[in-house]
UniProtKB/Swiss-Prot annotation:
It comes from the Eukaryota. Interacts (via C-terminus) with ANK2 and ANK3; required for targeting to the basolateral membrane. It comes from Homo sapiens. One of its GO terms (biological process) is ammonium homeostasis. This is Ammonium transporter Rh type B. The keyword Phosphoprotein does not apply. Residues 1-13, 83-86, 146-149, 202-219, 273-282, 326-346, 415-458 are cytoplasmic. It is a multi-pass membrane protein.
Length: 458
């Protein structure tokens, strides 16, 4: 391994060069392919003689604002629990999301809205891009503290492409319904990140174990992320559902599911906690599992009771996962899941997909009436039975797991390339490796950073 000067020079050049290249290439592609859609273009909109009040901006933008806040504030602050990694948690979330939303606009545009030689964008494409960024940030949670920014940008470059392809296969080729992304966002993002983490397994991570925990104020800041996500999750699930009853029902189901998952989390956390005390890790994360578990079925006729039951189940399963399964995941399967994305997004995402299979299989014309067309158009048109739709939903889950697993494996191999800057084993979960930290000179005088230390990878 090169010594400190060459390593510092490489770190100085890698990130700016990659950022400039990615932004430059994206800008060129935007110039060539991206155009306003008919609801955004001045000439096209006014030529159609619509009232301004009919523009989709007024129906979709409030949801977009909520989704945007979730991505940049909710996800960012949820990950600041690490005692010495707050700058990186929020800062790299900012960086990844800013790149992912541009790149996903292109990838999703080529797959979903490419006609006349151009990609046509509007507020719905902004929401879809944020959804994709959310999946990338979920994967980031699995490798938080163990990767550098250049590695993360390359991860996003690959993951956005696979996310777009998986989404296209599920929604357009298989006709799967997944309004809130239990499969396309949460399951995909979680298992992509978990497989990536397995490939990047660091057997000497014990050297940084003392930084992997939280302190009082870092947990408090992380709780800000939890509250933002909890408040805005109904908008997240409902952002792109059919206007009217469908969107209303989606928000309602998510609202009740989140409430039930919160009570389930508090109950289980106290039950399995030491001396009956609550664990803030459980509250920060498992309380949100209710939003994940109804992602697929929230626009369906789940019923308020069904939403409560699903949320409570997700909260309990997620809490038990944090308590018992995360240690097994690392010790037995060599998956170092920093944020526990398997418990918040992975297992609840799979449960949500299976719940969607069940609710889709129970769909009838009597239950949905004329609303069947907006929720299950293929059933309404007579092209599928409810049972067939349920089977397609189940197959969509397997397709998602396949794309996520293969993609995570490829991503891990990409990120292990020796010339990419990666923090040494003794400096994981440490902001000073990548950031100018206030007071770092005094800290270095006591504990100098050994940036020249060789990396150890399996």
């Amino acid at each position: 391994m090169a010594g400190s000067p060459s390593r510092a020079a490489g770190r100085r050049l890698q990130l700016p060069l990659l950022c400039l290249f990615l932004q430059g290439a994206t800008a060129v592609l935007f110039a060539v392919f991206v155009r306003y859609n008919h609801k955004t273009d001045a000439a096209l909109w006014h030529r159609s003689n619509h009232s301004n009040a009919d523009n989709e901006f007024y129906f979709r933008y409030p949801s977009f604002q909520d989704v945007h806040a979730m991505v940049f504030v909710g996800f960012g602050f949820l990950m600041v629990f690490l005692q010495r990694y707050g700058f990186s948690s929020v800062g790299f979330t900012f960086l990844l999301a800013a790149f992912a939303l541009q790149w996903s606009t292109l990838v999703q545009g080529f797959l979903h809205s490419f006609h006349g030689g151009h990609i046509h964008v509007g507020v719905e494409s902004m929401i879809n891009a944020d959804f994709c960024a959310g999946a990338v940030l979920i994967s980031f949670g699995a490798v938080l503290g163990k990767t550098g920014p250049t590695q993360l940008l390359l991860m996003a470059l690959l993951e956005v492409v696979l996310f777009g392809i998986n989404e296209f296969v599920l929604l357009h080729l298989l006709g799967v319904r997944d309004a809130g992304g239990s499969m396309t966002i949460h399951t995909f993002g979680a298992y992509f990140g978990l497989v990536l983490s397995r490939v990047l397994y660091r057997p000497q991570l014990e050297k940084s174990k003392h930084r992997q925990g939280s302190v009082y104020h870092s947990d408090l800041f992380a709780m800000i992320g939890t509250i933002f996500l909890w408040i805005f999750w109904p908008s997240f699930n409902a952002a792109l559902t059919a206007l009217g009853a469908g969107q209303h029902r989606t928000a309602l189901n998510t609202y009740y599911s989140l409430a039930a998952s919160t009570l389930g989390t508090f109950a289980l956390s106290a039950l399995v906690g030491e001396d009956g005390r609550l664990d803030m890790v459980h509250i920060q994360n498992a309380a949100l599992a209710g939003g994940v578990v109804v992602g697929t079925s929230s626009e369906m006729m789940l019923t308020p009771f069904g939403a409560l039951a699903a949320g409570f189940l997700a909260g309990t399963v997620s809490t038990l996962g944090y308590k018992f399964f995360t240690p097994i995941l690392e010790s037995k399967f060599k998956v170092q899941d920093t944020c526990g994305v398997h418990n918040l997004h992975g297992m609840p995402g799979v449960l949500g997909a299976l719940l969607g299979v069940l609710v889709a299989g129970l769909a009838t014309h009597e239950a949905y009436g004329d609303g069947l067309e907006s929720v299950f158009p293929l059933i309404a048109e007579g092209q599928r039975s409810a049972t067939s739709q349920a089977m397609h939903q189940l197959f969509g889950l397997f397709v998602t797991l396949m794309f996520a697993s293969v993609g995570g494996g490829l991503g891990g191999l990409l990120l292990k390339l020796p010339f990419l800057d990666s923090p040494p084993d003794s400096q994981h979960y440490e902001d000073q490796v990548h950031w100018q930290v206030p007071g770092e000179h005094e800290d270095k005088a006591q504990r100098p950073l050994r940036v020249e230390e060789a990396d150890t990878q399996a």
